[in-house]
Amino acid sequence: MLLSADDKKHIKAIMPSIAAHGDKFGGEASYRMFLVNPKTKTYFPSFDFHHNSKQITSHGKKVVDALNEAANHLDNIAGSMSKLSDLHAYDLRVDPGNFPLLAHNLLVVVAMHFPKQFDPATHKALDKFLATVSTVLTSKYR
């Protein structure tokens, strides 16, 4: 999915706010995904799935850090996420259907925490960005 100049502007405007609270927002999004879609837990057999557990907040921070890295390379998301794509496709073998689930939950969390900043244009841009990242992360699956 091609990101327009306007999309990139909105992503660059909101990502620093999300990244500043990566453990909190990423943890909330992960917790929501695990709660609403229990099958996603299978890839994390040793996790404590309680709200604000150390494993969930740590995983959430990794997710947001990776998204922030991608946001810093909007003209080369595939290149900036290549190693992470390899990890998910070849080592972790995560179900590619899980990426859109986490993306949806991250949109919910961002909308809750930034209601004024999360206007329709930002919503559209962030949704396109997360879809692009999901596509990149699943590009090496067969």
Swiss-Prot record:
Tell me the protein's name.
Hemoglobin subunit alpha-2
Q: How is the quaternary structure described? A: Heterotetramer of two alpha chains and two beta chains.
Q: Which residues form the Globin domain?
A: 2-142
Any single GO molecular-function term of the entry would be: metal ion binding
The tissues in which it is expressed are: Red blood cells.
Gene3D superfamilies per record: Globins (1.10.490.10)
SUPFAM superfamilies xrefs: Globin-like
UniProt entry keywords in alphabetical sequence? Heme, Iron, Metal-binding, Oxygen transport, Transport
Tell me the PANTHER family matching this sequence.
HEMOGLOBIN FAMILY MEMBER, HEMOGLOBIN SUBUNIT ALPHA
Q: Which residues bind O2?
A: H59
Record: residues binding heme b: H88
Q: What species was this sequence derived from?
A: Xenopus laevis (African clawed frog)
Metal-binding in keyword set: yes
